[in-house]
Curated annotation (Swiss-Prot):
This is Probable 3',5'-cyclic phosphodiesterase pde-6. It catalyses: a nucleoside 3',5'-cyclic phosphate + H2O = a nucleoside 5'-phosphate + H(+). It comes from Caenorhabditis elegans. The keyword Transcription does not apply. Its cofactor is a divalent metal cation. Coiled coil: none annotated. A divalent metal cation 1 binds at H506, H542, D543, D656. Binds 2 divalent metal cations per subunit. Site 1 may preferentially bind zinc ions, while site 2 has a preference for magnesium and/or manganese ions. Transmembrane segments: none annotated. Residues 426-750 form the PDEase domain. Keywords: cGMP, Hydrolase, Metal-binding. The active site is at H502 (proton donor). Its EC number is 3.1.4.17.
Length: 760
């Protein structure tokens, strides 16, 4: 037994804090308050810090503690008949079972008083295993911040106890029980007043009843273990969904967000959805498994069944990375050969390796992937084509290589964003035929060529105003409806009506497709308003003043535009530059940006330029790889605009090459139009003795269905598979494949005689 102090016949005891100043002489030795605080605060802070979960590769909830720095514990003197006693053991052996987890019962408290704090209450707390630190009012805030106690007791005799309680609440990173202490019970009126300062309980100095504090301490220690569990759930590769007894979603982890594309805030609080779980992409190699087996129901081991947990089964092949949004990190390998950006292969290998390692190597690999994803390393490498595949080779030579070394570089990517603007119908007067033709402009089967006919080749201005009004473009730009109408008429007038394909109707078609893509909820949630408007405007101007000849032709003929833009994205640079020249000229009165601030205009212009340049087919694989590296969950707020722009780049690009995915009749007619334009370019190149850009488009020998299959193989299939998976518009890829099969059937039936009068 320890020595006894003669004060009040109290039994001396070894301090639970393990401070040497208290171990032999008893608690009432004559020490200064500062010395007492120093002896108590340091071990309490150390023990409190040790109790916090720390994430490395495993999770710990609490550190070890022994009296006097050792592992043993001597007998403890019994306090004056407390209501709740604890065995005279080291505090390090007190544990609580929280489900399958063992939680250390580390109970820390701060006593805020100007005295010593010694009392029946303090004796009872210590006897019950509480580690108590006495703190002066001036030190209370810093002590609470460093120790992170479960409870704070405030002596009502100190000055401004309510303010101390507020200060303690403001600095505490954990939930803390704040209790007032007085010589006697206080009135109900004062209790209510103290409650305004987060003081929610009251005791007297001579109370021995600490059962409530022990119970709160037990719950608080359990609650403080939960962040470790949530952090582990967020790090796991398997998607997890937790529902309450009403089957309302309470929690989903980060892997669930990656798999579904749904942000956590969108799902929590919503009823569970079996359809949502069934619609999730499967891990690779699990195609034979029934959908109902993809998700495992985990029964929570409690009688009331108040929670339901669903976990996506891991891939049987062990490829844990497959649960992430598989927007084709590895390309869909076109049938024409291996088209793969080297950076995609590197990142795929790194991702596979990271799934097999833990700890520091895994983090190092993630850091390396982040660096690689943020550098301009996405220009494609065309490995090889089959010798007999002239179509793919000539598409590459004519549209990408341009008869000179192409050195495309790429900006970095990130992710995520906000919502689109609402919609309402048109106000402008139009003829009945035009109005009927515009009836379903928000549908994918919309017939823009019929609108071209009934509007006398004014499809762009007609569908443009309908789309702009639905998306409230005037509100975003701060311009009038009349001004916007004058602008779109000016843009329409500068398209070449003589071009069979690159004319104002094609611009209208791309604008309608852009609006359709933006209308997808899976897209809209990630795109901010200004980028949505920029995408619509960019679609309208993306081929402005197109001469009906490609970039390679302009280079070979040494056109002034090729010289001006140094053979880089010649037409795309010209389209957007002319659009801004026409818009900003003072005497035209069509400046739709006049109400924007300088910063707003710069941002709008940057977005439009970026989106129009993304339509350069020679940079197709660059932008595709950029989109593939994008993640749309758990991204910092400052990176969401970058992600929004990346989505819009891909969106406008897909709209520009969307003809193969249109309804079959439209698909055919658009194909005939662009082939006719290529026929004319090939004829002119041969007449002038120029290098022939794509010899396959010779009217006398061309098999049009083969050229369309080649374009789908090389460009359209992967782009649409990638984007429509993200946008949840799988029916478009289905239509593209259906058209592909029709073209394929026609290849054996096509003869050069069909090439006459393709466009009637």
């Amino acid at each position: 037994m320890g020595d006894r102090s003669g004060v009040g016949g109290e039994e001396g005891e070894k301090s639970v804090l393990g401070a040497s100043a208290h171990s032999q002489a008893g608690r009432r030795q004559q020490h200064t308050p500062a010395a007492r605080r120093g002896a108590q605060r340091a071990p309490a802070a150390t023990a409190a810090a040790a109790s916090r979960p720390v994430f490395a590769m495993r999770w710990c909830c609490g550190g070890s503690y022994s009296e006097n720095g050792g592992g043993g514990g001597g007998s403890r003197g019994a306090p004056p008949t407390p209501l709740l006693t604890v065995a005279a053991t080291s505090s390090s052996t007190a544990h609580d079972t929280f489900g399958p987890m063992q939680v250390k019962m580390l109970k820390t408290a701060v006593i805020v008083t100007e005295g010593t704090g010694e009392s029946v209450l303090l004796d009872s707390l210590r006897a019950s295993g509480w580690i108590c630190t006495v703190s002066f009012p001036t030190q209370a805030t810093s002590d609470v911040e460093s120790i992170c106690p479960l409870a704070v007791f405030i002596d009502l005799r100190v000055p401004h106890p309510s303010q101390i309680a507020k200060d303690v609440s403001s600095v505490s990173t954990e939930e803390v029980l704040i209790v007032s202490i007085a010589e006697k019970h206080i009135s109900e009126k004062r209790r209510r007043a103290l409650a305004q300062s987060n003081i929610i309980h009251h005791v007297t100095w001579n109370t021995r009843d600490v059962v409530l504090f022990d119970y709160v301490g037990r719950l608080a220690n359990r609650i403080r273990a939960l962040p470790a569990l949530f952090a582990v759930l967020d790090e796991t590769d398997q998607a997890v969904e937790i529902c309450d007894e009403q089957r309302v979603v309470q929690y989903v982890n980060r892997a669930y967000e990656n798999v579904t594309g749904c942000i956590r805030s969108e799902v929590i609080g919503q009823p569970e959805s079996e359809m949502r779980r069934k619609s999730l992409p499967r891990a690779r190699g699990e195609e034979e498994r029934r959908r109902s087996c993809d998700w495992k129901f985990i029964r929570v081991p409690f009688a009331n069944n108040s929670q339901f947990v669903y976990m996506k089964r891991s891939n049987t092949t062990g490829d844990t990375a497959a649960i992430f949004r598989d927007v084709s990190l590895k390309s869909l390998k076109s049938q024409t050969g291996g088209i793969e950006a080297p950076i995609s292969e590197v990142l795929t290998m790194l991702r596979d390796v990271s799934a097999r390692v833990d700890g520091e190597p895994a983090q190092t690999i993630k850091d390396a992937m982040k660096v690689l994803s943020s550098h301009e390393l996405y220009a494609p490498s065309i490995n090889r084509f089959r010798d007999a595949d002239r179509i793919a080779t000539q598409y590459y030579d004519g549209l990408i290589r341009l008869h000179h070394p192409a050195r495309q570089r790429k900006r970095s990517v990130v992710d995520a964003h906000r919502e689109k603007r609402g919609s309402h119908g048109e106000r402008r007067r139009v003829s009945a035929d035009v109005k009927n033709a515009l009836e379903n402009d928000n549908c994918w089967k919309f017939d823009i060529l019929h609108l071209e006919k009934v509007s006398d080749h004014h499809a762009l201005s007609q569908v443009g105003m309908k789309v702009f009004e639905r998306w409230k473009v005037c509100d975003v730009l701060g311009c009038s409806d009349d001004l916007l109408h004058r602008w779109i008429l000016s843009i329409e007038a500068h398209y070449h009506a003589g071009n069979t394909y690159h004319n104002a109707t094609h611009a209208a078609d791309v604008l309608q497709a852009t609006s359709f893509f933006l209308d997808s909820p899976s897209v809209a949630v990630h795109v901010n308003e200004s980028h949505a408007v920029a995408a619509l405007l960019a679609a309208a101007v993306h081929d402005l003043d197109h001469p009906g000849r490609g970039n390679a032709y302009l280079i070979n003929t040494r056109q002034s535009l090729a010289i001006l833009y140094n053979d880089n994205s010649i037409l795309e640079n010209h389209h957007i530059a002319l659009a801004f020249q026409l818009t900003l000229q003072h005497n035209a009165n069509v400046n739709i940006f006049s109400s924007l601030s300088r910063e707003e205009f710069i941002q709008m212009r940057h977005a439009m330029v970026e989106m129009v340049l993304a339509t350069d087919i020679s940079r197709h694989f660059e932008y595709l790889a950029k989109f593939n590296k994008m993640h749309v969950t758990d991204v910092p707020e400052e990176q969401r605009d970058t992600n929004s722009l990346t989505i819009c780049d891909m969106l406008v690009k897909c709209a520009d090459i969307s003809n193969p995915a249109r309804e079959w009749g439209l698909c055919q007619r658009w194909a005939h139009r662009i082939v006719e334009e290529y026929f004319e370019q090939t004829r002119e190149e041969k007449e002038k003795g120029l290098p022939v850009t794509m010899e396959v488009f010779d009217r006398n020998t061309c098999n049009v269905p083969i050229t369309q299959c080649g374009f789908i193989d090389m460009f359209a299939r992967e782009a649409f598979a990638t984007f429509t998976e993200f946008a949840k518009l799988g029916e478009l890829s289905d239509q593209l494949e259906s058209n592909y099969e029709k073209w394929k059937v026609m290849t054996s039936q096509w003869t050069p005689t069909h090439n006459t009068n393709l466009v009637l």
